[in-house]
Amino acid sequence: MQTADGSNTVYNAVVGENYHSRNGALQESRHVFVNAGLHYFLDTTRANTVSVLEVGFGTGLNFLLTADYCTAQNITLDYCGIEAYPLSPEMIGQTGYEQYVSRGLWQQFNQQYTQSMLAPTTLNANSQLPTANRQTSTANCQLQIAHCKLLQFDTEKTFDIVYFDAFAAAHQPEMWNEEAIAYTVKFMKPGGIFVTYAITGNLKRMLKALGLTIQKIPGAAGKREMLRGILEVRD
């Protein structure tokens, strides 16, 4: 279905909710995750590498926008998405998101989407650039999609940023309880960033108890506020 900003979302019949806000899939993804998460981290750290854990990979829009920016800025990206109900490759190809990212990235994503659920895969997002441009880019983009529920996910990695993009608590309350939030936070690096479209008193209390400093910032269209948390660095 088309959302208010003209971008598309997909309805998940199992959960009973769309993957993105009806007020605009593209604007929500850019505002909540790319701007408040990725850009904030890069602006404050000046890093040339970044790792992202997304809870709720969904349509892949957050990944695509993140990878497109990192490729353009020559930033190495390690991206892991958790998804219990992965969309089919055919559905991914029908989202229309190719208009928001480079042709090379879109083609690589579609080609590697299924493979990335089996093992981490490297996307050569610069494959459609002229040879001279490709040679000046040293950044790479690694994608892994974990086809499992959150509490079944495991890795030895820790991440710079968490995109917490689970379905709303009204549809998936188990994703917003203390066990799920604590399990997610354990995969964060000290100083790491946690961003989500939701902000509730209970969520703020849980994150504070887990050692995060909470920032309330303006939300995407249709929401007054969103939440950004920063995991405190402890001696």
Stretches found by the model and what they are:
Residues 177-190:
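A short glycine-rich, Lys/Arg-flanked "PGG" loop and its adjoining helix->strand segment in the class I
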Residues 191-198:
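Conserved beta-strand signature within the Rossmann-like core of class I S-adenosyl-L-methionine
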Residues 93-155:
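S-adenosyl-L-methionine
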Residues 60-64:
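Glycine-rich SAM-binding Motif I of class I
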Residues 49-58:
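Conserved class I S-adenosyl-L-methionine
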Residues 143-145, 159-166:
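Short SAM/SAH-binding signature in class I
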Residues 1-50, 67-101:
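Rossmann-like AdoMet
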Residues 200-235:
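Class I S-adenosyl-L-methionine
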